Amino acid sequence: MLKGMTRLVSRVHKLDPGRFSHLGTQAPQCPVAHLDNQVPTERTRAISRTLENDPAKHGEQHVGQHYNISIQELKTVFPHGLPPRFVMQVKTFNEACLMVRKPALELLHYLKNTNFAHPAVRYVLYGEKGTGKTLSLCHIIHFCAKQDWLILHIPDAHLWVKNCRDLLQSTYNKQRFDQPLEASIWLKNFKTANERFLSQIKVQDKYVWNKRESTEKGSPLAEVVEQGIMRVRNATDAVGIVLKELKRQSSLGVFRLLVAVDGVNALWGRTTLKREDKSPITPEELALIYNLRKMVKNDWQGGAIVLTVSQTGSLFKPRKAYLPQELLGKEGFDTLDPFIPILVSNYNPKEFEGCIQYYLENNWLQHEKAHTEEGKKELLFLSNRNPGLLERLCAYL
């Protein structure tokens, strides 16, 4: 079995998931829309599961156990931001289950004891590739959504600094560039996750879009969001206005605000984008990045800033880099300092056992030795308890 599984490791990145029926196909924009009429079935609860589905009540006793998020809630809270392979797992198992892990519990403890009269505290999740930073961030987002926070979620900041489909000179500031398609897509997902807030929050300034259209002071923030969705040319400016209004009004105590950015290191460094004369565009010249940088400053109150630094998708960084100072660079590190670093490491023994048991309960491991202690030891050896590698190994067993 060891030789066979070793060969799988070498092939795991070469295999095309689309060729395997149990992995499903690439996720659509709303990853769980096809599950509207499906109800997750109850299974026997074992070591891998907990009946406590409220993140606010998770504690040390739940480490290594999976909790369930209803399909409807998943659609609302996570219209974007879930890892593609996790989306495949949701499709395959017909349920969405997140593992309770120590880094998320540490962060939950901090959030529960936050003094919101003080400036927003920055938390940075970091760790080696595949350790589960994004899913730990999703656990925090789910907690805040259940606590009725407004969620400002940037699922992968790296997508804003490379391979842009449409880049236009900003009408607001000629020194910057708009990304209308990226901005419009983000606004649609922001609306899905926060629709209940948008009619309640009133803009505190008048915003003029063109000679005929404007949003008056006191209008619902929903009007700004709709302007960006319906008039894609105005989407980048609409995002800037939304961020400005949220930052200002959360400080007034109107609502609690979570700023969650996956891959925040993309905000500093280099981009792949170029002007017409082929000269490079820097991140601060992109209006979306310029405005997002303002949101990760701790000069506002009434919320929290939870960030991840990630080598996945990053540009011009060593493949093995994972420490904040390595990925952020001097400018980014100095901008975010002070922050609370939270290491997301490989599974501990309890988490590893919970993951294996979860796969076994769902009949995901078909190899004849997968149920044995010998099989578990070989999976442990081959994966080194790395969550991402373990998931890929198990997908082909």
From Swiss-Prot:
The enzyme's E.C. designation: 3.6.5.-
Q: Where is the transit peptide?
A: 1-17
Q: What class of enzyme is it?
A: hydrolase
Q: Which compartments is it annotated to reside in?
A: Mitochondrion
* Keywords, comma-separated and alphabetical: Acetylation, Apoptosis, Hydrolase, Mitochondrion, Ribonucleoprotein, Ribosomal protein, Transit peptide
Q: Name one GO biological process term.
A: apoptotic process
Q: Which reaction does it catalyse?
A: GTP + H2O = GDP + phosphate + H(+)
Cited PANTHER family: MITOCHONDRIAL 28S RIBOSOMAL PROTEIN S29 (PTHR12810), SMALL RIBOSOMAL SUBUNIT PROTEIN MS29 (PTHR12810:SF0)
What's this chain's function?
As a component of the mitochondrial small ribosomal subunit, it plays a role in the translation of mitochondrial mRNAs. Involved in mediating interferon-gamma-induced cell death. Displays GTPase activity in vitro.
By sequence similarity, the record places it as follows: Belongs to the mitochondrion-specific ribosomal protein mS29 family.
Q: What name is this protein filed under?
A: Small ribosomal subunit protein mS29
